[in-house]
């Protein structure tokens, strides 16, 4: 099975990819700028995905995470980019957790429920005691449903991502 040949990589990169593929849980690739770490990591991640259902990719900078993520997306790998969207490059914005969460099919229902919770809370402050009791029950049901939807959306997002990328 090993070593795997990658004719498009130089010998150092090929050795690094094979070492990553031989590790059990965690692999760290480091080195000076311009030495091919991104290319090496993308290949190692891509090959790992033939053996594992999901890979967590972490790097010290958002730029590095975005470079790796972009190259994986270009290869058709489903990536979920975690992190502050203001620090993510434009090409990767549609792959951020926040954007994917808001574009999930269940999000409109969740948004509507959150709106109802706000409106009900506002009415509760103005209502009589008996009205507030009924509204409390409604709020409880709304919150329970919102939690169910949030869990569903998160499960879908994380289960469908082959790569989860973050700083």
Where are these regions (language model features)?
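P-loop (Walker A) phosphate-binding loop of NTP-binding proteins
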Residues: 32, 60
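Hydrophobic positions on the alpha1 helix immediately C-terminal to the Walker A/P-loop
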Residues: 40, 44, 64
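Conserved ATPase "switch" residues in P-loop NTPase domains
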Residues: 49
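Pre-Walker A (Motif I) flank of P-loop NTPase domains
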Residues: 23-29, 52-54
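Conserved P-loop NTPase motor core of helicases/translocases
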Residues: 1-2, 46, 54, 58, ...
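Conserved glycine(s) of the Walker
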Residues: 36
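N-terminal pre-P-loop "Q-motif" helix
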Residues: 6-25, 39-40, 166
């Amino acid at each position: 099975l090993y070593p795997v040949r990658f004719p498009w990589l130089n010998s150092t990169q090929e050795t690094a990819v094979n070492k990553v593929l031989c590790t059990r849980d965690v692999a760290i690739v480091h080195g000076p700028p311009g030495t091919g770490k991104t290319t090496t990591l993308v290949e190692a991640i891509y090959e790992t995905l033939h053996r594992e259902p999901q890979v967590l990719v972490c790097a010290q900078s958002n730029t590095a995470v975005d470079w790796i993520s972009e190259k994986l997306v270009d290869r058709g790998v489903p990536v979920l980019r975690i992190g502050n969207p203001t620090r993510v490059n434009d090409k990767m914005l549609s792959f951020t957790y926040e954007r994917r969460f808001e574009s999930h099919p269940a999000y409109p229902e969740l948004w509507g429920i959150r709106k109802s919770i706000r409106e009900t809370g506002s009415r509760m402050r103005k209502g009589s005691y008996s009205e507030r009791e009924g509204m409390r029950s409604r709020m409880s049901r709304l919150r329970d449903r919102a939690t169910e939807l949030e869990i569903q959306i998160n499960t879908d997002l994380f289960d469908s991502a082959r790569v989860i990328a973050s700083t």
